[in-house]
């Protein structure tokens, strides 16, 4: 890696692999990270340091449960730029966080067991299909 010259380094991963790609990118000068369904990786200070030096494109599919762990009360944060995939497969860059919170709370109040419905949204095949469709539209 020291001899990479002017070549750009990219890291990517899904789920825990996404967390590992973020940690790897944080240790590589100028690395760009793409992750899909990634859990929260670090503290607020880690996130700020990462965002200052690196780029991360974080994709979250609708109700995917993994990006919601560890819980916020444990003070873990997401780094990078959120690309949210809604239930219709549309991708929105950095959607309004209050709206996202409202949707989540509303879903939990309607059906507390609905959190289990986030498990199928973690499927990497869905991420691949939605992101590929989005790229083909551009």
Which residues are covered by each model-predicted region?
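Non-catalytic, mobile gating and regulatory segments of ester bond hydrolases
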Residues: 1-12, 16-138
